[in-house]
Amino acid sequence: MHSSALLCFLVFLAGVGASRHQSTLSEDNCTHFSVSLPHMLRELRAAFGKVKTFFQTKDELHSILLTRSLLEDFKGYLGCQALSEMIQFYLEEVMPQAENEDPDIKQHVNSLGEKLKTLRLRLRRCHRFLPCENKSKVVEQVKSTFSKLQEKGVYKAMGEFDIFINYIEAYMTMKMKI
């Protein structure tokens, strides 16, 4: 009887130790995240560079989709939600359409999407960067404008992806100072 109780206790201690180790790993990943962020942003910019000319030359509209209001939302109390919603918007609405624009760019748009998914995953693992639940009115406005632009919306949204990367960088820089 004593040996089975001892065995259960040892299994319990092993589990506690493993969970502490996992927690430490997660915290370490968040600590190193600020070091790896510039590299991830460079990778996003490089991936976007492969499709930038294609989308910007097809964008014939003289308006801005990603306005300064979005950057202000990123910097404000809704920054977390605005960033989360914009990443989701690009991954679920913009990039699937962008992939269908030309077979020659499909692979590059897909690669850009994978890099954005990796960034989102790392942000979610470090709750200090994405601890949010509220909706951003500016993001809803971006989505509404995108929809109204119909087939031209994908050129506009993809053509301005570099602005989006800059806004991500501004948000992350602000969060790292906190």
UniProtKB/Swiss-Prot annotation:
One of its GO terms (molecular function) is cytokine activity. Belongs to the IL-10 family. GO terms for cellular component: extracellular space. Glycans are attached at residues 29, 134. Its main location: secreted. This is Interleukin-10. Residues 1-18 form the signal peptide. Major immune regulatory cytokine that acts on many cells of the immune system where it has profound anti-inflammatory functions, limiting excessive tissue disruption caused by inflammation. Mechanistically, IL10 binds to its heterotetrameric receptor comprising IL10RA and IL10RB leading to JAK1 and STAT2-mediated phosphorylation of STAT3. In turn, STAT3 translocates to the nucleus where it drives expression of anti-inflammatory mediators. Keywords: Cytokine, Disulfide bond, Glycoprotein, Secreted, Signal. One of its GO terms (biological process) is interleukin-10-mediated signaling pathway. InterPro entries: 4_helix_cytokine-like_core (IPR009079), IL-10 (IPR000098), IL-10/19/20/24/26 (IPR020443), IL-10_CS (IPR020423). SMART domains: IL10. It is found in: Secreted. Homodimer. Interacts with IL10RA and IL10RB. The gene is IL10. Disulfide bonds join 30-126, 80-132. PANTHER family: INTERLEUKIN-10 (PTHR48482:SF5), INTERLEUKIN-19-RELATED (PTHR48482).
